[in-house]
């Protein structure tokens, strides 16, 4: 049953006016700009965030719906772009490390949407996330690991794919450096929230009901960092809308980037 538009509007207004309701129903809410990376570190330390079982369950329910739609032949734009970025490498059945894999759903996305599939490994710093990933995909390789200290040798994977985790890493510079180190051929930074005309900032918000930290990156800084760590921009895609200008005062969007790794001479 579809409710009339006026009732839907009233319902949304009621939800947004109640902190308890909006945190239980809305995916992301209660944004606040933080003053520094140090404040962001403190905010992360004070909350279980992505480590909490309740947060993991809520995120998982949301992505199960996306996977179901994909299986019906209706993949959301970000899933299609992720597969397109892997395909744009030109590699056949590449080895792919996903950094910040959550409950592992991109292993299913790549199996379904990348011709020839990939040899997938996923890592996440949340033991709860990895436990759920192993439950869902018992034949796939998952490890508990930190994006800023990847437990792999240099050039271990054809592609390092950072799905939606770079936006939650305060030490994003280190995470980019580690991705470049472990990648043998390519790095993909997917659905990265960026400003085109403003500096990098840190936000605190509630995601799936839990307080987390988010980074909106200055696009020019992101590309400069990648170049600094031996990566060359090959292609970029506009991804799903994500404008937090109501909070920051500056328009933002999400983009996906394919970088090749420059060979040392």
Give the residues covered by each predicted segment.
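A short glycine-rich, Lys/Arg-flanked "PGG" loop and its adjoining helix->strand segment in the class I
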Residues: 173-186
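Short conserved loop adjoining the S-adenosyl-L-methionine
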Residues: 149-154
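Class I SAM-dependent methyltransferase SAM/SAH-binding core
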Residues: 103-148
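Conserved class I S-adenosyl-L-methionine
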Residues: 4-90, 94-102, 188-216
């Amino acid at each position: 049953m579809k409710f009339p538009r006026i009732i839907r509007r009233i319902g949304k207004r009621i939800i947004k006016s109640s902190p308890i309701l909006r945190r239980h129903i809305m995916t992301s809410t209660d944004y606040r700009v933080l003053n520094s990376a140090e404040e962001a570190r403190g905010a992360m330390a004070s909350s279980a965030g992505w480590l909490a079982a309740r947060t993991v369950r809520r995120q998982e329910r949301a992505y199960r719906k996306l996977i179901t739609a994909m299986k019906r032949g209706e993949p959301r734009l970000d899933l299609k772009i992720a597969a397109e970025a892997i395909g744009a490498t030109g590699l056949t059945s590449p080895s792919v490390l996903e950094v910040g894999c959550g409950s592992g759903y991109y292993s299913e996305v790549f199996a379904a949407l990348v011709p020839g599939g990939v040899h997938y490994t996923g890592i996440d710093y949340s033991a709860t996330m990895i436990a759920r990933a192993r439950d869902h995909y018992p034949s796939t390789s998952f490890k508990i690991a930190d994006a800023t200290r990847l437990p792999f040798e240099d050039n271990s994977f054809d592609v390092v794919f950072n799905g939606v985790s770079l936006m939650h890493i305060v030490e994003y510079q280190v995470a980019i450096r580690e991705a470049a180190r472990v990648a043998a051929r390519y790095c993909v930074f997917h659905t990265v929230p960026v400003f085109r005309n403003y500096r990098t900032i840190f936000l605190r918000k509630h995601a799936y009901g839990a307080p987390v930290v988010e980074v909106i990156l200055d696009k020019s800084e992101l590309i400069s960092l990648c170049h600094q760590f031996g990566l060359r921009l090959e292609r970029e895609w506009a991804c799903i809308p994500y404008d937090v200008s109501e909070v920051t005062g500056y328009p933002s969007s999400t983009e996906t980037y394919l970088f090749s790794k420059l060979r040392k001479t």
